[in-house]
Amino acid sequence: MSKGRVLVAMSGGVDSSAAAALLVEQGYEVIGATMQVWDYSTCDIEEGNGTCCSSIDVDDARAVADRLGIPFYVINCEAKFRAAVIDPFLKAYLEGQTPLPCVNCNTYLKFDHLVKKMRELECDYIATGHYAKIVYDDKGKASIHTSTDDWKDQTYFLFTIDPELVPKLLFPVGDMKKPQVREYSESRGLVTARKKDSQGICFVGNQGYQNFIKDHVKSEILASKKGLIKRFPEGQVMASHEGIHNYTYGQSKGLGMDYHEKLFVIKIDASDNTVWVGEEKHLFANEVDVVDPKLLDEIQDGEIMNVKIRYQHKGAPAQVIKTASGFKLKFTEPQRAVTPGQAAVFYRDRQLVGGGWITL
């Protein structure tokens, strides 16, 4: 007897392939679906080499579905992806921020577009290859927790999920480590078993985000983002630059200037296109403002939580204080290179509680 019908989001990578295979083994009625999100022929990227949902990835996902004997759908999401992921990505850099496109992709495509497909196909669950876990408490309430593989854990990108969707989520590889996922996939004869992981931003690839921006933003707009590099905090003009989109907080290489000491980007002021550089000590901050929060569970005003300010950040204890626009975070220890456009994500032990967007 089937445990229920589940739609698996298959990116064409090993993790989602393994997720589909595990669910078949566990007795679910599995349906695979891949989102075609981007025309990689418009970019200087080799398809299938660290990409996600390209035509080659779609073919790989279909091959896995055929191997498993499950139905498979391709959903064209290019227009939605452009509007919800690419355009905000470009806009953020032009405003002096460092965007986090994976969260937008999860919010507006994986857990929106695919959820609609899940309901259309009358599925009971939706599954992905994310490294995360669903845990039920003694009252039967479901919550998202970090995965067994701390290094690969992807809960940082999941804080915008609708809480009502959580009981319908399955993360089959959440109890496994990456080498186990590859070994399992190989044992099942899946073509993706030794496929490279996607690295960095999937639609940018190895060309670098500056080149991607240059290819997708009009030259006159880029020219309007030129400005000065000034010393922080004194204000001494040190050089000119070719655009604030070429810089991010904490950057120390490729500043476009020579100086006798190592300097870092401390602040980017989009109002006058000034890039402020200074000593590393100026990168540290005790307090951070977070806007547009999304919560999966309640937070007590002033509660101490473990907060991650970027992916692969180990997290640090901070007091979470409610404000009119979101939260103010007061860290126990100063944090380095707190970056506007990135997310601050809250954890209670291993439970994902919510998060919001960093602003300075």
Swiss-Prot record:
Keyword terms, alphabetized: ATP-binding, Cytoplasm, Disulfide bond, Nucleotide-binding, RNA-binding, Transferase, tRNA processing, tRNA-binding
Thylakoid as UniProt keyword: no
Domain of life of the organism encoding this protein: Bacteria
Interaction with tRNA (site feature) positions: H130, Q342
Any single biological process term in GO: tRNA wobble position uridine thiolation
Pfam families with a match to the protein in the record: tRNA_Me_trans, tRNA_Me_trans_C, tRNA_Me_trans_M
Catalytically driven reaction(s): S-sulfanyl-L-cysteinyl-[protein] + uridine(34) in tRNA + AH2 + ATP = 2-thiouridine(34) in tRNA + L-cysteinyl-[protein] + A + AMP + diphosphate + H(+)
Class of this enzyme: transferase
GO terms for MF: ATP binding; tRNA binding; tRNA-uridine 2-sulfurtransferase activity
Region (Interaction with tRNA): 152-154, 310-311
EC number: 2.8.1.13
Annotated residues for binding of ATP: A9, M10, S11, G12, G13, V14, D15, S16, M35, G129
Enzyme active site: C105, C202
Family statement: Belongs to the MnmA/TRMU family.
NCBIfam families: PRK00143.1, trmU
Protein name: tRNA-specific 2-thiouridylase MnmA
Organism in which the protein naturally occurs: Bdellovibrio bacteriovorus (strain ATCC 15356 / DSM 50701 / NCIMB 9529 / HD100)
Lineage of producing organism: Bacteria, Pseudomonadati, Bdellovibrionota, Bdellovibrionia, Bdellovibrionales
